[in-house]
C-alpha cells in the first residue's frame, strides 16, 4: 500500500531567476517591451512577464513554450 506522502510546493528560486533572466535577454534582443510580450502571450497585463523575469512566480511549461515560440527560439534556450 502506498504511503501517505505530503506534497511539497516545488519552487526553485535560483532556477526561476535564471529562466527569467534568459526571457529578458531574448525579449530585449527582439526589441519587445514586457507589455508587447504579454500581449503576444494573450495577457492584458505586463506584470506577469515582469514577475517571471525577476524569478518571482512559478509558471507552467505551456507558458514557457508559448514565450519561446513568440521569441522564435527553442524552449531549451530558456532553461538554466
Language-model segments: which ranges?
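Residues within the helices of the helix-turn-helix
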Residues: 24, 35, 65
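A short, Lys/Arg-rich alpha-helix, primarily the initiator
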Residues: 3-29
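Short alpha-helical DNA-recognition segment
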Residues: 31-51
Amino acid at each position: 500500500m502506498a504511503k501517505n506522502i505530503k506534497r511539497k510546493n516545488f519552487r526553485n528560486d535560483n532556477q526561476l531567476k535564471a529562466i527569467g533572466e534568459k526571457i529578458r535577454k531574448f525579449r530585449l534582443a527582439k526589441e519587445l517591451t514586457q507589455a508587447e510580450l504579454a500581449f503576444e502571450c494573450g495577457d492584458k497585463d505586463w506584470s506577469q512577464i515582469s514577475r517571471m523575469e525577476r524569478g518571482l512566480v512559478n509558471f507552467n511549461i505551456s507558458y514557457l513554450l508559448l514565450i519561446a515560440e513568440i521569441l522564435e527560439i527553442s524552449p531549451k534556450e530558456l532553461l538554466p
